[in-house]
């Protein structure tokens, strides 16, 4: 069964080496809500992500990919892209990549208590604004 376009749900991930922030939102409202941060690495991270996927049942995933201020790639850019590929391979969901420059800085400037989840919200809202 295909989900009507307006009702599509997305789960955004703000990937970090030790922590991953989450946000959920949908195409209809074009807003995102923070869903906390997990502190896990390796396979343990994917177990925790699977739990979130069962809870939210998103139609697609959105992953923040960091770049230098001038747009150049760096080591974490490659890590985030690898993570996005791993998500697609493990969970068979579409994965969209979003430039996440300054999202954590913006989240902290807004007074976020959980900067990673707040950054995931910003990433998801940027993505939702970019789709028709």
Q: What is each of the regions a protein language model found here?
A:
Residues 2-13, 17-132:
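Phosphate- and other anionic-substrate recognition elements at nucleic-acid/protein interfaces
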């Amino acid at each position: 069964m295909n989900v009507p376009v307006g009702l599509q749900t997305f789960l955004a991930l703000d990937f970090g080496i030790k922590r991953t922030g989450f946000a959920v939102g949908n195409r209809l409202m074009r807003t995102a809500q923070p869903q906390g941060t997990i502190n896990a690495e390796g396979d343990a991270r994917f177990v925790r992500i699977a739990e979130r996927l069962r809870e939210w049942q998103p139609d697609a995933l959105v992953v923040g990919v960091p770049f230098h201020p001038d747009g150049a790639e760096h080591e974490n850019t490659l890590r985030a892209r690898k993570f996005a590929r791993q998500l697609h391979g493990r969970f068979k969901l579409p994965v969209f990549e979003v430039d996440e420059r300054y999202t954590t800085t913006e989240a902290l400037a807004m007074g976020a208590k959980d900067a990673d989840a707040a950054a995931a919200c910003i990433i998801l809202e940027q993505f939702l604004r970019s789709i028709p």
